[in-house]
Amino acid sequence: MSRFLRFTVFPLFALCFFHVQAQRSLPSIAEYTKGMVLHEGYFDFFYDESGGRILLPVRPDQMDVEFLYVHSLPAGLGSNDIGLDRGQLGGNRVVKFVRAGNKLLLEEQNYSYRAESENPAERQSVEEAFAKSVLWGFSCLAGEEGGFLIDLTPFLLRDAHGVAARLKEAGEGDYRISEERSAIYPARCKAFPRNTEFEATVTFEGEPSGKFVPTVVPSPELITLRMHHSFIQLPDEGFRMRPYDPRSGYFYIAFKDYASPFTEPLEKHYIICHRLEKKNPLAERSEPVKPIVYYLDPGVPEPMRSALKEGASWWNEAFEALGFIDAFRVEDLPEGADPMDVRYNLIQWVHRSTRGWSYGGSVVDPRTGEIIKGHVSLGSLRIRQDFLLAEGLLAPYGDTSRLEEAREMALARLRQLAAHEVGHTLGLAHNFAASCDGRASVMDYPHPYVLLDEEGKMRTDKAYDSGLGAWDMRAIAYGYAPLPEGKEEERLQEILQETLSTGLHYISDEGARPSGSMHPCAHLWDNGSDAVVELERLLVLREKALQKFGLDNLPPGRPVAELERIFVPVYAMHRYQVEAVAKWIGGVEYTYAVKGDGQQLPRPLPLADQKRAADALLKTLGLSVLGMPHGWLELFPPPPPAYQRDREFFRAWSGDLFDPQAAQLALIDHTLGLMLDPQRLSRMQQLAVYRDDVWDIEDYLKYLFKSIFSSKPDSKEDREVAMLVQKRFVVHLLHLAASDEVNPQLAAVIEDLLLRRVSYRTQSGKHWAPEDNPAFADFRGVPFVGDPNFRAHETWILRQIFLYLKDPAFFRQDPSVPLPPGSPIGCGDSR
């Protein structure tokens, strides 16, 4: 035998010998677990009650076999601001147990990099090129017939969900796991045929440093949550992956396929969806092999329960249109069923200390995009916020017949919300352009569409739509329509072309959420195909609501100070439509066009439309919009004991008394912040370099200057509002000039306009440009003749310019005073 073979074969022989010897030296699994209760399922497990341990026997046929590992929070923190909600899902990880001597390693596979090839060597080359992750190593306690027994307990008691990191990120303090206060939660450790579920009570110990933990935890230095761990059998073969198309409206999985021809993209995308097949593929209408069934959390009370069931059930219409019979159902969760059991798609009712977002998450097979379990989390306080909106609009306590109308408006929103979040768990992304097509999708964020009847009374019967929209039907067709064998791609393209022929708009989050985004149709919480027309209509409704605002908006027996809580969303009723209109300025129409599909390529919005938008926004900076309702002082007293001004109120400089100027300033900053968004202005400046049919940035800013500084107030309040707008306009411009977020030429234009356009009235009445004003030298200037209040105002403006010239960094921080949280209406963004 050669020297090389001797040195190679002997270590291999020794390794195998010691492995066998190691197993022989271990007690048998039966011996080690004597007296323990065996739970049989996908993974069997023993619960050692005396030691508080979970022991997992891993059979030989389970070694090197992939399965899905998911962690979640069945019992959460209860703070919307921090997150960590009840039912929150963690990531989806494909893992397997790998034998390593006398240890088992739980190894996460890397499906982000693959070789979709029949050649094993090609697949192996990619697998070896990129790292895996060993999540845990387990010492073997016992063994027999090639299987091993491991103690899963330390793995289950770790911070799998990243709780400590989330608390630190939220500024709530440094926390660590307290081992002596953590234990297995045996009541929720169960084994099922396709999945095995484990749960643990985990306590975090630390020093709280934020303001949110103390509001939801009895002893803030000790946070006790429950963490759930699911070992899930991966679906069998047969799921037909559907290629993702940016026009389809779906979420997707993505991976790099190194077996792709070099003439094709390296990265592949496939949609996320449930498996759905007809029992009889040849029949025009057929029952499914397995329907998609969602189950309601038994903790949802009436009448919310019925509303959720009705709204979620709307989706069956879309599947019926594809030839399925009862393919989608909503049922009550069976008694005794575990909500975290992967066999149940769940609609869960989540309580928090403050209102917050609802969301639809899913357990997804990362290999294929198949949804294994849909999990909807609905915030229970949403409906209270919707009812509060109705109280502000309808003043139902002066006419109790309107009280039922207010309740129905809140329930109508809940139906729509249930459909929206279930839509996410079917694989659908947001469509924030659907409002341009007459409320064409439940995947949009709807603002209540309130009308005035012939008598001038508010009507809310059409506040929220009922049923799916046209876009929803088309989107479900792409993800779930049966596809003819061998012609799958051809049929999918036909579906897309049919959708395009309807003229429906589709723009998702990245084109709608940023305040500086540009699409004239893609907005959150808006209505109408013409944003400007809708803003004007909404302001009429708002004025009507403010004119009659008073004690009839407040329930009997409530402190009058709580009326301000109802007033806030009425006064700021137009905030989201303002954002929609602002996107017309520097706006660009575009689609998710694919070569050859004939869709609109990017084009700037016509200049006339941009000016129409600017005029509409400038009107919101006038007294007609910012003025206070008559008798406001009597309506908003300071809060009594046990009540307080919280973040749902406007900020105040005047202590506990309502501060009208602070409320006005917040709305002024909201509008100006959108009109002067750095992305918006940079886009305008750049487009004007290459096109003559757009609004030049200097002309735009001059237009704003002229409108804002040429107002002629005719009352004390009007004058105060005008001066406040001018102050905030200058401060916002100085912030932009000092910002690193705008291109240099835009900063130069802003700086030049400020220095040349802000005037100072001298004794002779002549207006001097700032660079000629003596005040620039020593801030003494010529004595001012006129209103001392206005003199102080102009002096303040000049002072800001001096501060900027001395130290631009002083203005780099965003100067905006935020409005009280708006989203979510009824779902954290607080614009």
Language model feature labels by segment:
Residues 1-23:
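Bacterial Sec-dependent N-terminal signal peptides
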Residues 23-300, 318, 332-385, 390-406, ...:
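Auxiliary tRNA-acceptor-end handling modules of aminoacyl-tRNA synthetases
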Residues 437-831:
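Conserved catalytic/binding loops enriched for acidic/polar residues
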Residues 313-324, 423-424, 428, 448, ...:
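Sec-exported extracytoplasmic/periplasmic mature domains
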Residues 370-374, 378, 418, 422-426, ...:
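Extended catalytic-interface subdomain
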Residues 332-351, 412-468:
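The catalytic-center signature of Zn2+-dependent metalloproteases
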Residues 88, 298, 302-310, 408-413, ...:
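Soluble non-cytosolic domains of exported or imported proteins
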Residues 63-64, 301-327:
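Zn2+-dependent metallopeptidase catalytic core
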